[in-house]
Amino acid sequence: MSDLYLTLKNGMKMPRLGMGTWMLGEHLSIYQQEKKALQAGLDEGFTLIDTAEMYGNGLSEKLIGDTIQGYSREKLFLVSKVYPHNAGRPQIYDSIDQTLHNLKTDYLDMYLIHWPLPNPK
């Protein structure tokens, strides 16, 4: 079972496998299908969910927030990413607040800069 997790330097255990959510939540016509797919993954033990504020302009985060209700937050490993242009002060505070609101949680397990370079033109 220990092979399923990577122990980070702070002692936290991060699942080695997870679910990416790029392009999820963008189309209301398949929202329930996407929610069921995420639930199926969670039910099978895929507890790491990766998203970003740019995925559907927050709609992916909102889908995840709706989906994880009823699951133990402590058993999930939520990762989100901030746009590079929002990574400075004060924008990063607004971005993380919006992400937490969208995900309906009060903390993230990991928060990353989506890419460390200026936005492509």
Spans of model-derived segments:
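A structural signal for isolated positions on well-ordered beta-strands in alpha/beta enzyme cores
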Residues: 77-79, 109
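Active-site beta-loop-alpha junctions enriched in small/polar residues
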Residues: 22-24, 52-54, 81-85, 113-116
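Glycine/proline-rich, positively charged
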Residues: 28-29, 47, 87-121
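N-terminal binding-site loop/beta-alpha segment at the start of enzyme catalytic domains
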Residues: 1-76
